[in-house]
Amino acid sequence: MTIMRKNHPLLKIINHSFIDLPTPSNISAWWNFGSLLGICLMVQIITGLFLAMHYTSDTTTAFSSVTHICRDVNYGWLIRYAHANGASMFFICLFIHVGRGIYYGSYMLNETWNIGIILLLTTMATAFVGYVLPWGQMSFWGATVITNLLSAIPYIGTTLVEWIWGGFSVDKATLTRFFAFHFILPFIITALVLVHLLFLHETGSNNPSGLNSDSDKIPFHPYYTIKDILGVLLLLMVLMFLVLFFPDVLGDPDNYTPANPLNTPAHIKPEWYFLFAYAILRSIPNKLGGVLALLLSILILAAFPLLNSSKQHGLIYRPITQTLYWIFVANLLILTWIGGQPVEYPFTTIGQISSIMYFMIIVIFMPMASMVENNILKFI
């Protein structure tokens, strides 16, 4: 068997990626989230496939078909809520995975980091089009508001929006194409994941110390396969707890009302994992400025390798930048909270301050802290 896994053309690839892969001996539990994201993607594709067997992408029957899945299909409610809450678990793992990358300086693995940003954007697009499919009130109005943002693009904006809608408003054509996008995008994500892993295995994993670990590597199996299985069991336990006890805790009650173009909900807001970006969008009074800020809130991640001037890898021995990092995390949580609040004082002011802080910490404060820490090193 050993010879076969090392020589067989297909098994050889799996062997080099998951069995004999040389891995730093000191990587912590924060490195588990890559494999957890893989499990989340598998759960989403499998549950999504079964949902697609019963779902109809027509404005007259979409809401009814989701109700039918929950009421009449064997374990349909379980599949539907596993898919909905699986998306939340996916984004929790994604945010922690990106946060770990920032903390330990993994962004210096340029190709892996940039593919990761593309993966994040693709996953956000997939989640957005997926949220439209149940055709509830928040699905319809969320689709209307977010797609309408493209009208801020000079000259081509209005034409672009109507092209995406397939008409002059969000309607049957929009729902059909969003279902098509939602079906194909997870497979594109899977392909991007393979590219992400390909680039990662070219350089090898980063580690908590930030030092070169070539002299101290161990095989991925059995050490990290066992560690990952523990993470997977914990993830599935939390997911099942959510699905079986609090299936709607992360959803919006408005989405249990069928879509009505004549009745606008009091507060239009996206799913919780987009609220930080939504708060940044709302904090700028100008439409085009808001759209650019929304895009930059994600694309700014690409600036980390460019803005890094530290002589050390990661933040483990950098107390000033470490403090800024945790302020940044707290600020992100504040933005998430603000995104779900109505547009009124004091929420608008808090949102504007937090949005400015979000960009200033990354672009100004962290590079300045790096320079200060570099100078302190001279005196040690």
Swiss-Prot record:
UniProt keyword terms in alphabetical order: Electron transport, Heme, Iron, Membrane, Metal-binding, Mitochondrion, Mitochondrion inner membrane, Respiratory chain, Transmembrane, Transmembrane helix, Transport, Ubiquinone
Binding positions for heme b b562 per the UniProt entry: H83, H182
Cofactor(s) required, per the database record: heme b
Annotated InterPro entries: Cyt_b/b6_C, Cyt_b/b6_C_sf, Cyt_b/b6_N, Cytb/b6-like_sf, Cytochrome_b, Cytochrome_b_C_euk/bac, Cytochrome_b_N_euk/bac, Di-haem_cyt_TM
Name listed for the protein in its UniProt record: Cytochrome b
Organism expressing this protein natively: Microryzomys minutus (Forest small rice rat)
Gene Ontology terms: biological process: mitochondrial electron transport, ubiquinol to cytochrome c
One GO CC annotation: respiratory chain complex III
GO MF annotation list: metal ion binding; ubiquinol-cytochrome-c reductase activity
Similarity comment text for this entry: Belongs to the cytochrome b family.
